[in-house]
Regions:
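An accessory alpha-helical subdomain
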Residues: 181-187, 192-232, 237-240, 245-257
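Generic C-terminal helix-cap and adjacent flexible tail
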Residues: 259-262
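Catalytic cores of RNA-modifying enzymes
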Residues: 1-206, 246, 250
Length: 262
């Protein structure tokens, strides 16, 4: 029996009803699927039955014999670190430019970089992913909630985010220290052009840089802009100098970016 490896963040899920629910929620019938970290094939066994073509990245080469039991002529596994691979080239070669749907029980320690890589690659259209509950709470959070932060706002600018299911830690082997959550991300048409998107991301990150500081102080410190101009832009949104970042929704940050830079 394969022993989970701590250095790879391995925790294996075995409840077949839950596994099937996760795959069903991804709606991948006759679609192209990329799986990250298939592990012992818990999700893989259901994905390959539905998917048109299947590709996976698995960092642990010792799982090769186990995973090859699930493969057919329309499926393949690359035994490499997803974050260290030339993913765009691999996807172009294998899927020939067609849309792809990402599924994965993500290692907690690399969840955020994987999500940002998903956002960067145009071919990847949706992601149905298992994440640490604390991270999932941030992903689905809304303004004025304690869990709402820069990551929440940036992610929700690029995608529609929905909760699929909460997963108790006791459903894993070995049992991790935290609960999990399955969320689904669906990329959407964005509202700003590319140059303004970079400004939007900068503004959001700076706004949350020091949560105890006001929005005005964070932005005037971080942006090379006149403080009076920033305050004028805030007032045009019916905000004042005491406003803090967590009270702005995604659309508010979009409008603020346009006020400052259009």
């Amino acid at each position: 029996m394969h022993q989970a490896k701590k250095r790879f963040g391995q925790n294996f899920l075995t409840d077949k009803n839950l596994l099937k629910k996760i795959v069903d929620s991804a709606q991948i019938h006759d679609k192209n699927v990329l799986e990250i970290g298939p592990g012992l094939g818990a999700l893989t066994q259901f994905i390959v039955k539905d998917a048109q073509k299947y590709l996976a990245y698995e960092i642990d080469y010792s799982l090769k014999d186990v995973l090859e039991n699930f493969l057919s002529e329309d499926s393949n596994i690359i035994f490499q670190d997803f974050l260290e691979s030339d993913v765009t080239n691999d996807l172009d070669t294998y899927f020939k430019g067609e849309p792809i749907h990402l599924i994965g029980n993500l290692p907690y320690y690399i969840t955020t970089p994987i999500i940002f890589k998903f956002l960067e690659i145009d071919q990847l259209k949706t992601a149905t992913i298992m994440v640490q509950k604390e991270v999932g709470d941030r992903m689905i959070s809304k303004k004025n909630l304690k869990s709402y932060n820069a990551f929440s706002a940036i992610l929700q600018y690029f995608t529609d985010v929905r909760l699929v299911v909460n997963v108790n830690r006791k459903m894993f082997n070995p049992v991790p220290k935290v609960d999990s959550m399955v969320v689904q991300l669906t990329k959407k048409e964005t509202k700003l052009d590319k140059s303004l998107e970079l400004k939007f991301i900068q503004i959001v990150k700076l706004s949350f840089m020091h949560k105890r500081k006001t929005l005005l102080n964070n932005l005037s410190t971080g942006l090379n802009e006149d403080k009076a101009k920033i305050l004028e832009s805030l007032k045009s949104l019916n905000l004042d100098e005491k406003t803090r970042a967590e009270s702005l929704g995604v659309d508010d940050f979009i409008t603020l970016t346009e006020k400052l830079y259009k």
